[in-house]
Amino acid sequence: MSTEQSVTEKQETQVGFGSALGTGSLLMTLAGIAFIGYGIIFLVLNFIGGGFELGVSHLAGQTPADLDPTVAYYISHLHVATAGFIISTGIAVTALSWFGVRRRQLWAWTTAVVVAVSGLIIALPMHYMGGFAHDWVTHLGPIYLAVIVFVVGVVLAYKGL
């Protein structure tokens, strides 16, 4: 009689939050929720904020109110789209982490990592090319904090898969 669990039984076993997998998947989930929160703040500030976006109050000495209304609207519509994609990424990471990674689904772990990393690899380099001044603590700080939580979660979860 074998005492080892089959793959299906192992996947269905409840993951304890003291385990590497449990803690890792929880941290990945919390990071996904943080991505959603950042996207919501990004979206709301588009409509009620005084600057261009979080941590960017002016560009070349101008505020959005100084711009031609058509240009300001165009920038606004790009911010809404960006916020939508940040929120969507957060939803994907949250769902994959909570419902897939926690159940030892390697495909869910891989997809959550690819979704988050691809978005960050595309978005972050532009912030360091010197095209505009921004307060990096308020502009990127929340995302960096969420990324640190995510990476710790990714490593812990992988150890438990």
Where are these regions (language model features)?
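Topology signature of small-to-medium multi-pass alpha-helical membrane proteins
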Residues: S2-L161
